[in-house]
């Protein structure tokens, strides 16, 4: 196996649910050279995560590794071992020790009952015969290595800057107290990026030769994602550690991996050096994955899909992209002046939604429950959304995007400011007027599975708003409306009696879009509505949203932390930071000539293939 840390040969994983038979991984072969990173890419259901679980020995019933060999060589001076020939007890000695894994959602991987110090020291003592105090020392060292805790030297400098009269023993006491306080924090007290660093610290605590990272940055915004990717890359270089990096984001792979392997329906269809595969792909599926990504350097009327390439139509559909926005240089707005459109703007229409000096705050209460002050999630913003346009809303987690969306939908009451919809002041609407407004404003959420009732068939889910608002004369007409909507979003009227769990993630999001359209709204907020989808399904949903907008004259606010997606779908972009508007302008202008350092930071943090390889086509 040369100097490979792992050598996978003819690996086959099958599932036997009830009387069915599914081949999830179909005889794949790959190696990961020592000290290098292999990016494993493909759509949801392609077999990526099952491959990782097979390496870790975690494929559970009804799954089974039915063929193949997995040769693992933690050190170059030790002979390779076929992991599939080891007993469960022997496999446990490698799992978490010489081979470790971090998952997509750290909150579900960490036990909420125990503090992070306990969980890291437990992992250390599971694989090393060390005392509790030594395990604690190692846990602190790992947290410093992943940059959650400052180094001892920095902690010492901070203590002396705060009070230079402290004695050496007092300084040491303060340093130890800071370390202890961090170890005693619980998962719910940390942000998503901090939690992922805790998972990385736990994974590297026993010096693994191979780290498997399964979608570790998918749930993070671009700036936090960039920090985590840089950290993983630095750790691999410093430790000589190999990594299997699983993702559906090809830009992330381009910035992280040395080699890439592409999976499709359980098969490995293409593999090689990262530059070679991404600049000259050979397999139609790889070409499709690359083409269906929204790109910052292109303005397309719609995105190609993977199926275009698998059917041989991709080259025609991607040629000569149509501009969706002709930038006239007019439309750049400051955060202080809401002069959104001039007479020469390329998209002139009447305002649908106008927001004036909006403030939304959450009370921070004192010891007796009285509000002492307010945390301002949205702090004095003003903007206008025009009929038929898409306003992209971007910013880091916690900047106020979702709070703003809920306020516009009248789910949260503002402290100050006014909201006008179709020329009417809706700020304080209640009762019948608010009920009437609900028909005109809808939302599509990020997670389609959690926003659909698992006990209701999709037909009942979509017909529910029609019943509530007493639309159409009878149940037959309502069912016809549901059937039409399902057909319009790319499903079948025959799916009406099926349940959410019977659909894929992309299909469930189409169901949510159909439900949002049921009442013929004028205005829809898409709150991270494609963030949970892989790149090929994302392209299909984005194309669908644009088609529906043209057909029904819809107006969107599209919220996302993926700036390349926002650029593709939006006419204008509004950047939020700490509850305020950084800048607003046409999508083209914002990305070509951002006016604020914060916007430039967001754009620079986007992982793209084009940045890595200077691709011009």
Question: What are these regions, as identified by a protein language model?
Answer:
Residues 207, 520:
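Conserved catalytic motifs of ABC-family nucleotide-binding domains
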